[in-house]
Amino acid sequence: CASLPDGSEAWYYMRIVEQDQGHVNEMLALAEEFSSKTYKYSDAQSLAMYMETSPSANSSALGTVTLKDTFTQLTWGSLGVERTGEAYTKLKELSGNLANVEIATHVTAKDGEKTETYEVTENFTMKWASQRIYMMDYERTMTELFTGDSDLFSGKRIILGIGNGDGVHA
């Protein structure tokens, strides 16, 4: 229980589970390798084994990309992005032979003479098996960072660029 400034109390709980770390290092390494390979088309060929491309998937959007999308989307289409700065890898959950890993980073892409910056979050759900690690789910969200440059305004409109469809947040 925590006491709040107004005198009220807030109750919370935390889950702490001690378990064998098992193959968590291999799963973290797979997430990092998968992520870095998407930046170079030729390196990404080995990722095709994880793809589950669906004909009903939106084959042109880069705001949200999953294993059901196209290989071209997975490899950033024609955007030509480069990772900038550190990529932050986080083990979000580990339960037996299942792990959820998140990688957060920034990427840049040239648009003519202008450089655009994007915030990227990748989520991996993996299952370890004795033969290999299975990629159960993958989702990459990408949102262009709004700079406020004058060329991003058109009359009464603001041009926001690539987003993941969650709307605008201040």
List each model region and its residues:
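Alpha-helix capping and helix-coil boundary motifs
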Residues: 40-43, 95, 131
